[in-house]
Curated annotation (Swiss-Prot):
Belongs to the AccD/PCCB family. GO terms for cellular component: acetyl-CoA carboxylase complex; plastid stroma. Pfam families: Carboxyl_trans (PF01039). This is Acetyl-coenzyme A carboxylase carboxyl transferase subunit beta. NCBIfam families: accD. It is an enzyme of class 2 (transferase). The gene is accD. Its main location: plastid.
Amino acid sequence: MERWRFSLMVFNNKLKHEYGIKKSLDSVSSIENTIENKDSNSKPNIKGRAQNIRSCGGRDNYSYNNIIYLFGVEYNRNLIPNDTFLFRDNKGDSFYISFNIENHIFEIDINFSCLSELEIERYFYSYHGFDYFNFNNGSAIEDYLYNHYMYDTPSNNHITSCIESYLQSQICVNPSIISDSSDSYIFGCFDKRRTHNESRRSGIRNRAQSSYLTIRESFNNLDSTKKYKHLWVQCENCYGLNYKKFLKSKINLCEQCGYHFKMSSSERIEVLVDPDTWYPMDEDMSSLDPIEFHSEEEPYKDRIYSYQKRTGLTEAVQTGLGQLNGIPIAIGVMDFQFMGGSMGSVVGEKITRLIEYATNKILPLIIVCASGGARMQEGSLSLMQMAKISSALFDYQSNKKLLYVSILTSPTTGGVTASFGMLGDIIIAEPNSYIAFAGKRVIEQTLHKIVPEGSQAAEYLFQKGLFDLIIPRNLLKSVLGELFKLHAFFPLN
């Protein structure tokens, strides 16, 4: 559980007499202050350090005369962060910043009438657990309020990077709320204590007059999460945001850390097979519910139809012929989006036919595995596919001495791991792939033992000798081409 608190401190013109602030109209202004240690019962002491404040974009109506703006992010570990904050400029225009760390979401919704008039004055900095706008010389403000409870967490890094990249190019935060009190300051504290069915408000308090000026924090019927979720994909590893339209061109790799997102079978075929060389096989073959399996939730035939409609596929594997860097190949690609890539009678039949065709035509064979195992809706018929495929591979490998490359992606489990997944002459795994026979939950519930974290990851299994290679997705095609040439398979031209 975590909580994020956002603080906005504004020191007004009345401080100039007490703290020697020099007044300057529509130009560079200076404020000499240093924020020292404070407790919950007293306000900050101000003295010391000079900060120059310049007008935003050279516009008079955005002047920062004698005001320093500190935008801080303070980390706490108590409550769930899930709120939306309203920021308003001195023209009354507003924008919202939404954070949902539990669901890995950061969003900004702008309601400005003219976005071009807004710009950031300097940069957004991160220093000792606090992030500041520094309008002086672009260096981080050294604040003696070092927060020893602030940690360099993925969630913190994610939010900091999101705010930094966006606000630097778009937004000028310019609150225009200044009290007339001689020694007052405005302190906005947005506490995150909202449940799923509640929306709460937080106030900006004038401590000298004990009056409250309310800023709306949470909004009823505000669902910005759903509004923009279709545009972005968040990395599970670094929490970075990836724009969906660019993700395909980057072969579903995270721009920040290179994490491998899941891919559909069609996307993998597009990556591995040369353009205009793909020729599908047995694409009209589909299951007929051989054991008439019916569940309380949904009949098997209806479930098959729903996945066919959703994915555009007839089954959980695509098989066919193509060329890889000009080398003719036979390739089968499983699709986890179709019933978890489960292996039923049709999947087994399509893969067996592909192997037999490659045997007759003396073609190298590639099978990309992504499966949860045998399909329970087809009972023992699905288990029979393990033996059928293994038998066809025996003839292909042992009798014809041809090359079979097995590529294991995340996840590869169950009957696929126990059969053709581990029978390759060369076994290649993608980085961070989840590969196992029985899943972690099944093992723990059956044996009542805790499965160590990472014990079913590709890197750990590689150290134990289960694979030959771990190849990143962007290098896979070139590596396969070199392997085929090494085994005397050459391009047609």
